[in-house]
Curated annotation (Swiss-Prot):
Species of provenance: Mesostigma viride (Green alga)
GO cellular component, one term: chloroplast
Superkingdom field: Eukaryota
Keywords: Chloroplast, Plastid
Subcellular location: Plastid, Chloroplast
Protein name (record): Uncharacterized 8.0 kDa protein in ndhF-psbD intergenic region
């Protein structure tokens, strides 16, 4: 069981960059007993981070476009 836990944590660290979100630290938190919960938090966080980044890029593009029009 411990080996499986370590393997899943390794996968989580590989898939999700730990610097992307502070909640990613929950992936490697030994206090998190439920692996499924930990993985779900990481996935939700990764999706949220990706959406926020996409929104930021969209706003940057629209503000550049607005600046070029004025």
């Amino acid at each position: 069981m411990i080996l499986i836990k370590k393997f899943i944590v390794a996968i989580e660290l590989f898939i999700f960059n730990r610097n992307n979100c502070r909640y990613i630290l929950l992936c490697t938190d030994n206090k998190v007993k439920n692996i499924q919960t930990s993985l779900s938090i990481c996935i939700l966080c990764a999706i949220s981070y990706a959406l926020i980044k996409k929104i930021q890029q969209t706003f940057q593009l629209s503000s550049k476009f607005a600046a070029s029009c004025s």
